[in-house]
Amino acid sequence: MLALGRSTTPALDLLAEASIAAAAAHVAGLGAPRLVIDATGFLHGAGFTPEKSLRDLDAAHMAHAFAVNAIGPALLMKHFLPLLPRQGASVFATLSARVGSIGDNRLGGWYAYRASKAALNQLVRTAAIELRRRAPQAVCVALHPGTVETALSAPFARAGLAVRPAAEAAADLLRVIAALGPDDTGSFLDHKGLPIPW
């Protein structure tokens, strides 16, 4: 197992494609990966909070949300999907969010996060089609881990939102990943392996 991030060697910064390419080259030197998990995301921080209304939209916040939640993962797919072996089972899984479901949006708000995760879901679906042509047994999926006890969810947990321990969420996602097959590629699934509407 190898974990990569901004503070690792090599560093991997979603906002810098050169670092993504360098990280992929490092991984390629270790052999073809059978499992790649992208566990990144941005909801709030640096003075930005989730929007409750159109009045709250901020171009810089939206651009950053799309950069981290959609463009960065797309660049990870660009550089890491080609590393998956052409034969045999392999998985690229990225963490999405149920709030990125257009069909399941009943509450509104959280414009930048919702839209950027919906964009991620489309990118996963599209990349899965291309991946299948090269590696028919490989799977590319978007996974919703549930609301997990992290810095991302901390402000909302204090407000009474039920959160799950990170270890529990990770174990659930690994069970879902272990059960994936080629027919699941391009799917958007929750932590129980159930499909989420697009």
Q: For each predicted feature, which ranges?
A:
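A glycine-rich helix->loop->beta "capping" turn
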Residues: 26-40, 45
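Catalytic loop of short-chain dehydrogenase/reductase
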Residues: 42-46, 50-66, 71, 86-134
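Hydrophobic positions on the long internal alpha-helix
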Residues: 76-80, 84, 123-124
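Conserved mid-core alpha-helix of short-chain dehydrogenase/reductase
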Residues: 19, 64, 72-79
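C-terminal helical subdomain
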Residues: 138, 142, 150, 155-198
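Flexible, glycine-rich beta-alpha linker
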Residues: 100-102, 123-159
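Active-site loop/turn elements of alpha/beta-hydrolase fold enzymes
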Residues: 6, 40-41, 97, 145, ...
